[in-house]
Amino acid sequence: MQHNQLLEQLYSGHSLSTSESTALFNAVIQGELSNEQIAAMLIALKVRGANTEEITGAVAASLQNAKVFPRPDYPFADIVGTGGDGQNTINISTASAIVAASMGAKVAKHGNRSVSSKSGASDVLTALGVNVNVTLEQARQALDEIGVCFLFAQQYHSGFRHVAPVRAALKTHTIFNILGPLINPARPTYHLLGVYAPELVKTYAETAVALEHQHSFVVHGSGLDEVALHGETQVAEIKNGKIEYFTLTPEDFGLKTQSLESLRGGEPQENTQYLTALLQGKGKAEHANAVAANTALLLKLFGYDDLKQNVQNVLAHLVSGKAFETLQKLTTY
């Protein structure tokens, strides 16, 4: 009966503690709630707005029930956005992960099929020839050997299948849209997390503290769940339990403002062509700049503090074609 009491608590507008949220989401992930109960719970949370404790509990339950990834002892990062910003851009964080890895960083990218865009991380990687359904061991091997691996959310969080039909029927943002970036089964040392709404920056930052993230950035870039070059980027930096909020502009990266329109993507096949050209050093300048800015902030987590220098290094590195070599290696796993 405990589930019913917790559900009743939500229906009456009351918040759940972290442990209560963990218990309720455990029940969801283990298939103990009906579709109707899941739908009611998701809407109750949406109408009131899930708080830090509730999100932290949902993350805890998700990780407790996920397949266990053999976590390496070296530092590694994830760069991932919530999706759902509705902007249909090229796959900036996917490209940034590959570029950073080709420059010596280690990145275990967590991702899924498209939420709202035409082409999610796994859609475009599949189109590029990457096997997104590799085993845990193969993913870990790729991370060790070439510095990057892709962890396909559906493979690691099989309990989410109980929620899938409800989410599809509701056709609206729910708490599950904001869980994705926080539930990487490899539990990375560092995170660059993009959120689709500015008000989520604070919520996410506080959740990252509750989850004891070592060093993370949460970003919202003028309507994008990435660092923006068409406007300002709101940033929360989480380090050793402390949060610092600040704003980044294109000038902070040594770049000029460019239009959001210049980053529009399309179907996976079209995005694949853009990304292939970019990683070969033959892409559009606007694409290269956007990936350079996001990779620059990602590299800051690894101790490369000068964003302008990072951008210059990334742009020079792209021309070498080494990032494309890393992608080609990734397709062999």
UniProtKB/Swiss-Prot annotation:
Anthranilate 1 binds at residues 81, 112. SUPFAM superfamilies: Nucleoside phosphorylase/phosphoribosyltransferase catalytic domain (SSF52418), Nucleoside phosphorylase/phosphoribosyltransferase N-terminal domain (SSF47648). GO terms for molecular function: anthranilate phosphoribosyltransferase activity; magnesium ion binding. The keyword Metal-binding applies. Keywords: Amino-acid biosynthesis, Aromatic amino acid biosynthesis, Glycosyltransferase, Magnesium, Metal-binding, Transferase, Tryptophan biosynthesis. Its cofactor is Mg(2+). Binds 2 magnesium ions per monomer. InterPro entries: Anthranilate_Pribosyl_Tfrase (IPR005940), Glycosyl_Trfase_fam3 (IPR000312), Glycosyl_Trfase_fam3_N_dom (IPR017459), Glycosyl_Trfase_fam3_N_dom_sf (IPR036320), Nuc_phospho_transferase (IPR035902). It holds the Pfam family Glycos_trans_3N. Mg(2+) 1 binds at residues 93, 226. One of its GO terms (biological process) is L-tryptophan biosynthetic process. Gene3D superfamilies: Nucleoside phosphorylase/phosphoribosyltransferase catalytic domain (3.40.1030.10), Transferase, Pyrimidine Nucleoside Phosphorylase, Chain C (1.20.970.10). It catalyses: N-(5-phospho-beta-D-ribosyl)anthranilate + diphosphate = 5-phospho-alpha-D-ribose 1-diphosphate + anthranilate. Disulfide bonds: none annotated. GO terms for cellular component: cytosol. 5-phospho-alpha-D-ribose 1-diphosphate binds at residues 81, 84-85, 89, 91-94, 109-117, 121. Belongs to the anthranilate phosphoribosyltransferase family. Catalyzes the transfer of the phosphoribosyl group of 5-phosphorylribose-1-pyrophosphate (PRPP) to anthranilate to yield N-(5'-phosphoribosyl)-anthranilate (PRA). This is Anthranilate phosphoribosyltransferase. It comes from Haemophilus influenzae (strain PittEE). The lineage of its organism: Bacteria, Pseudomonadati, Pseudomonadota, Gammaproteobacteria, Pasteurellales.
